[in-house]
Amino acid sequence: MNQYPAERIARARVLVVGDVMLDRYWFGEVDRISPEAPVPVVRVARREDRLGGAANVARNVAALGAQVTLIGVVGADEVGHRIERMAAEEGVRTDLVSDTEHPTTLKMRVLGRQQQLLRVDFEQHPEPAALDGISAAVARQLAQHDIVVLSDYAKGVLDRVESIIAAAVGHSLPVLVDPKGDHYERYRGATLVTPNRAEMREAVGRWKTEDELAERAQRLRLDLDLEALLVTRSEQGMTLFTDAGRDHADAAAHEVYDVSGAGDTVLATLAVMRAVGLSWGDAMRWANRAGGIVVGKLGTSVVTAAELAGEST
């Protein structure tokens, strides 16, 4: 694989649109069981916040050295303000829509001895007025970017994804989608869709052989008018389907510690590498390496340009 294209990446402009959320971690020690119920008592010693969902995709793009703008919905609350501050600190430009009726999506995890004990989610779908704001923000930003990434976590921001794809295609911009659910018709006309193994099974059913997977993947790709379809397959690596056929990269992870946000890292790396003109195959291999690095980290994390460049030497 070629040398890390740092200079070209610095000029790349990536627009990320999707479900923005905050991942909040409470770390502590467990030394007893509650007398109120048979559950562990965690003495919280440290709290850490990380950008999640589409915001994690954006921070991964920034960590690789590219320019990035994030569009999403936040509430008029502490969590929303925290996301805006953290995004700025990580080099992510934002064009966020404020929904005063609903809270910002928050995923709170409680960990003891580095093991996750509990996750609590706070979320509601945005109001139609907020979705109007998303459409307006996309219209403002498209002309200033080279590629569009849609990060769908089924929280409602991409309920009008068809119109966003159409607008991007109207500006001759590639559209990369991390999908959710089994209604893939919504993503028709995008450039690439990146389902994981479970999502692919949900969309096309189970397969028994690689040939059967290839047949179903190519049929789905052609039905949706996609240029490429990438199936991420955990320990089996990732498989790319295009007009040229099937291409595969074996898993690159040295040690799997936490898979949270790994798909975000893969999507961000694909977008950056395609924005600078790399082929689908080369972009997939860079993304595979990035995914292999990030699963060795705890929680939603990023892969830096230095880490990825080091892996290529």
UniProtKB/Swiss-Prot annotation:
One of its GO terms (cellular component) is cytosol. InterPro entries: Carboh/pur_kinase_PfkB_CS, PfkB_dom, RfaE_dom_I, Ribokinase-like. Keywords: ATP-binding, Carbohydrate metabolism, Kinase, Lipopolysaccharide biosynthesis, Nucleotide-binding, Transferase. The active site is at 264. GO terms for molecular function: ATP binding; heptose 7-phosphate kinase activity; heptose-1-phosphate adenylyltransferase activity; phosphotransferase activity, alcohol group as acceptor. It is an enzyme of class 2 (transferase). Pathway: Nucleotide-sugar biosynthesis; ADP-L-glycero-beta-D-manno-heptose biosynthesis; ADP-L-glycero-beta-D-manno-heptose from D-glycero-beta-D-manno-heptose 7-phosphate: step 1/4; Bacterial outer membrane biogenesis; LPS core biosynthesis. It catalyses: D-glycero-beta-D-manno-heptose 7-phosphate + ATP = D-glycero-beta-D-manno-heptose 1,7-bisphosphate + ADP + H(+). Its EC number is 2.7.1.167. SUPFAM superfamilies: Ribokinase-like. ATP binds at residues 196-199. The keyword Secreted does not apply. GO terms for biological process: ADP-L-glycero-beta-D-manno-heptose biosynthetic process; lipopolysaccharide core region biosynthetic process. NCBIfam families: rfaE_dom_I. Belongs to the carbohydrate kinase PfkB family. This is D-beta-D-heptose 7-phosphate kinase. The lineage of its organism: Bacteria, Pseudomonadati, Pseudomonadota, Betaproteobacteria, Burkholderiales. The gene is rfaE.
